[in-house]
Amino acid sequence: LPLLIYVDGKEYHDGIDISPGELYQRMRLNQMEVKTAAPTVGQYYQAFKNSIEGGAKEILCVTLSSKLSADYSSAKNAANLVKTENPESKIFVFDSRRAAVPQGLLTIEAAERLNAGQPMEDVLTYLENAWQKSSLIAALDTLEYLNRGGRIGQAAIYVGSTLRILPIV
């Protein structure tokens, strides 16, 4: 499911209503308020139910890091709701503990392994081992977007700008 992106209060679905390139370009050109939100429990619930009703025997959902987003929590709660109604359903929610490219690569590899016929248990073991070997380091050239996204306050911007400190995340 796509993340929800709010640009000046208007809702977009990541990669559907707005592309990353378009979002970044608009952010650079305008002083917009941009917020993100995880898909809701209800959205995950509906996606899981639709997949089961469509004949899925097993569902694997690889989420953004639970330390960065409510994505994992929403998916896990929805999976539990579906399992309560349909105890034989097999829904596996995996916290990638990653975001961006590392999460995407883990997800693609898991899908390829499942499509090649590997058992779900083996794919989950792979994911549990592989996430620890992946990382993403980003050097930021401005604190502006961290502030706009609500990650840091004005005091942090003042100190960072005054001392010319930029984070590596």
PLM ranges: what are they?
Residues 40, 64, 126:
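Residue-level "edge-of-site" marker
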Residues 1-10, 31, 67-84, 89-92, ...:
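Mixed-charge interfacial surface used for oligomerization/domain docking
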Residues 35, 61, 93:
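Short catalytic-loop micro-motif centered on adjacent basic/acidic residues
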